[in-house]
């Protein structure tokens, strides 16, 4: 979450190869101010995809609902959906699942270093994966 710092770039571990890096958008689908941007030091597009991370409803240890923000909220949202996708398509490997997620993104036709491949459409990813 370096987006509000002078160095706004994705860094470790989000800049690693062969992983799915998730940025955060707000309720309007706009890049959240705290969400890091790309490219990586070697010029790769990052983040890979985006999900809502601001505001996010959370439940604390006492069961109280509050709102917070961060890629720490957008990433588990995508991770859970990726797990469901992989469960539905068990014949796919990790690289194929990541590619399906990227290809289903709202920005897949023109990925950039702010939104990456955009907000993934997991229904689309499932159908694409099921057809291949």
Protein language model features and the residues they cover:
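Catalytic-core segments of hydrolase enzymes
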Residues: 1-59, 102-106
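Extracytoplasmic/secreted envelope proteins and their assembly/folding machinery
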Residues: 7-10, 19, 31, 75-82, ...
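Short, isolated positions within intrinsically disordered regulatory regions of eukaryotic proteins
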Residues: 11, 90-92, 127
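Short flexible/disordered coil segments
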Residues: 24-32, 61-63, 117-120, 132
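Substrate-binding/active-site groove segments that recognize
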Residues: 47, 120-121
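Hydrolase catalytic cores
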Residues: 53-115, 119
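Secreted peptidase-domain scaffold signal
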Residues: 124-132
């Amino acid at each position: 979450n370096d987006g509000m710092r002078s160095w706004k770039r994705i860094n470790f571990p989000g800049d690693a190869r062969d992983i799915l890096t998730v940025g955060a958008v707000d309720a309007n689908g706009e890049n959240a101010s705290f969400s890091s941007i790309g490219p990586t030091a070697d010029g790769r597009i990052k983040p890979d995809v985006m999900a809502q991370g601001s505001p996010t409803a959370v439940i604390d240890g006492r069961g109280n609902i509050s709102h917070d923000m961060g890629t720490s909220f957008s990433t588990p949202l995508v991770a859970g959906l990726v797990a469901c996708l992989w469960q539905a398509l068990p014949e796919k490997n990790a690289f194929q699942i990541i590619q399906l997620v990227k290809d289903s993104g709202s920005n897949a036709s023109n990925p950039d270093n702010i939104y990456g491949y955009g907000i993934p459409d997991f229904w689309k990813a499932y159908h694409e994966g099921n057809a291949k």
